Every structure is written in structure tokens, then in C-alpha cells.
């Protein structure tokens, strides 16, 4: 049976989207990656259920913070969102539980061992930034990287930015 309660839709967005706004009772432009801000807004608006779409708020713990204040959430908590947000976490999980499909890999946060591991792999490898990069953190040999020299240069860029990466 459908609920007879009146429904309201609130949206917390990073920018105004007229297509979404026309379906909402209220749209607020703000930092939906900030758990404190989202919780404050949810209390103010009387939110009882939240649907979180983007990965960034999941990675920053917004779902966890909402659950703590009694708001039901469609979207994983931070530790479960790591399956999508951390390449290293996912690869380690596949390895730990012997789940098929996990490629040979190593995780790096410095250049130590990078050249040697690339030599072991030959010409078939992928370098992935470990974290959220909006789809821009993956480079594939033959498509984006045409030599080990280019791969090493990309890895150096990631290290200089303070990033961890997976090969």
C-alpha cells in the first residue's frame, strides 16, 4: 500500500539544476560533501530519508553522519563505499578473499619499486589513482601510456600530488 502521508522533496546540490528544481519543494545550493552541513540541513528541513548519488559525499562520510541522527539513507556508509572510491581497498579485498578476477597489482605511494614492477608486467598494465578522480585518474598502457617512461612520469605526478596509486 502507498503511504497517505504528504511527500516533500528537498535537494541539496552543488549548483542550480532547473530540471531537478522543478520537481523539488526546495533546492539548496551548498557543500553536500560536508557531513556537518548536510546533517544541519536535514534537521532544519525535517528530512527522514536521503538518497545520495555522487561518490564524494559517500567517501566523506555523509551517509554515516545522517544514519547517526536517525535519517535513513539510500547509499552505502563510508567503509562500504570504499569498494568504489579506493582501488587499493578493492584489490586488497579481492586478494584477501581469493575472489577471481583480481589482476596482479601493487599499491604505491612513492616511486620505490615502480620501474621494477612495470618491467615485470611488460606492456599490459593500468595505472590508477587510488581515490576519487572523476574518471580522470586511470591511464591504460597502449591507450594513454605508450612506454614505461610515460608510465613512470605519470606515477611521479601522482606521488608529487601526495597520492597513492595502483598498478
PLM feature segments, named:
Residues 1-78:
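ATP-binding N-terminal substructure of ATP-dependent carboxylate-amine bond-forming enzymes
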Residues 100-103, 124-127, 141-167:
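Conserved ATP-binding module of the ATP-grasp superfamily
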Residues 42-47, 120-121, 160-161:
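Glycine-rich phosphate-binding loop signature in dinucleotide/nucleotide-binding domains
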Residues 67-71, 78-124, 135-144:
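Glycine-/Pro-rich loop/turn segments that contact NAD(P) or position catalytic residues
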Residues 15-16, 112, 131-133:
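Glycine-rich beta-alpha junction loops
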Residues 54, 129-130:
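Short secondary-structure boundary segments
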Residues 35-38, 59-63, 87-91, 114, ...:
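A general structural signal for well-ordered alpha-helical segments in protein cores
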